[in-house]
Amino acid sequence: MNAADESLGNVLLVGLGAVAIQVALDLRRHGAGRLGALNHPGRRSQRIAEALARGACLQLEGQGQHRWLSGNAALDVFHQDPAELRDDWQTLVLCVPADSYLDVVRGLPWERLGGVRTLLLVSAFIGANLLVRSALPAGCQATVLSLSSYYAATKVIDETQPLRALTKAVKRRVYLGSSRPDCPARETWRRVLAGSGVEVVPLATPEAAEGRNVTTYVHSPFFLGEFALARILSEQGPPGFMYKLYPEGPITPGAIGAMRRLWCELSELLRRMGAEPLNLLRFLNDDNYPVHETMLPRASIDGFAEAGAERQEYLLFVRYAALLVDPFSPADEQGRHFDFSAVPFRRVSRDEDGLWRLPRVPLEDYRKLALIVALAAHFDLAMPQARSLLASYENAVSRFIDCQGASQCHPSLYPIDSRPAADAIYRQWCSTC
């Protein structure tokens, strides 16, 4: 472990799931001060507390070419109750689902967190930075940083061992925006993530970084549609695969068309908020998963934004067809490459109280898109494609609730009113213009 980085100070991880375990390892390698974690009370938190009491530490296993990321990290303190926090922390890292940012920030005892200089949002959506700033108490001078998305693919290996996680992939590049463009924390986090081989590109505004959250563009058209929801909300039959072509998965010409139209709607929202939109195909290829130039020539990628709608949809379809297998994996003896797209949908399941719950995909994607649509209304944008996807989700979930019975379903299945949060984002945006 390196010497403590004074610009980070003591770091509190808010939320202690798979993402926090990866972040903790990166912070320990870089050199933070004290490292603590806060997790909301519940059965999982109790298991964490019991494991820590037995002397367990955070354990990360890197898979395949990322095996070198493996390691352990000890926590200096763990809290289940925000009321236990003291003014010991200079950096807060929000490792919670993005749709819970507002509730989490409002639930922190800011009267005892006067030393906090920086908040990092690990996977921000469009407007998240403004939303968090709107919830900070008057006089709070903390800088809020937005990462475009979480920079790895990490999961807890076994829920009975909540301190162990597996990282199977790491992004090549993520984007970072700050509420204060000249703040030194941007360079600090660039160095922290470089330790895992991730390039951090600073952008002029938080909204510019948030507009590069890949799940906003991909999950919504693929996983809020009829095919995906039929598999997610069913206990019977094959689960289907998230990134395969129909009939094995949700990818059809229609879904690709929805992706293109959603990108156009999001691009206009970003423009009105003063942020530069992205070239969707270049973003998907260069920053996420590339394909061979035989399938997508460089000129087609770079000229995507200027192409016509039909050409754009063709190029997007070619990309996802090219990623049915990992194009850069070695072929086996039969000449077959790794079945990259065979990621099964997670289905609804009953929680420990016997209530039906949706998996994070598509629940978080629905909530994020609902908030973006409510925000867009302040900029006189109708976003018909986004609204169509929201309606698809709401209708499918409503039918599921009717079938199972309302008493059997967790309240999180019901639609939410995103307008108050959107109003707060818009007021904060107006105050900074």
UniProtKB/Swiss-Prot annotation:
NADP(+) binds at L16, G17, A18, V19, N39, H40, T154, E364. It holds the Pfam family Staph_opine_DH. It is an enzyme of class 1 (oxidoreductase). One of its GO terms (cellular component) is plasma membrane. The active site is at H219. The chain crosses the membrane at residues 7-27. It catalyses: pseudopaline + NADP(+) + H2O = (2S)-2-amino-4-{[(1S)-1-carboxy-2-(1H-imidazol-4-yl)ethyl]amino}butanoate + 2-oxoglutarate + NADPH + H(+); pseudopaline + NAD(+) + H2O = (2S)-2-amino-4-{[(1S)-1-carboxy-2-(1H-imidazol-4-yl)ethyl]amino}butanoate + 2-oxoglutarate + NADH + H(+). Its EC number is 1.5.1.-. It is a single-pass membrane protein. Its main location: membrane. Induction: Is part of the operon cntOLMI that is negatively regulated by zinc level through the Zur repressor, which leads to transcriptional activation of this operon under zinc depletion. Highly induced in response to airway mucus secretions (AMS) treatment. GO terms for molecular function: oxidoreductase activity. Belongs to the staphylopine dehydrogenase family. Homodimer. Catalyzes the NAD(P)H-dependent reductive condensation of alpha-ketoglutarate to the intermediate formed by the adjacently encoded enzyme PA4836, namely (2S)-2-amino-4-{[(1S)-1-carboxy-2-(1H-imidazol-4-yl)ethyl]amino}butanoate, leading to the production of pseudopaline. This is the last step in the biosynthesis of the metallophore pseudopaline, which is involved in the acquisition of nickel and zinc, and thus enables bacterial growth inside the host, where metal access is limited. Therefore, this enzyme probably contributes to Pseudomonas virulence. This is Pseudopaline synthase. It comes from Pseudomonas aeruginosa (strain ATCC 15692 / DSM 22644 / CIP 104116 / JCM 14847 / LMG 12228 / 1C / PRS 101 / PAO1). The gene is cntM.
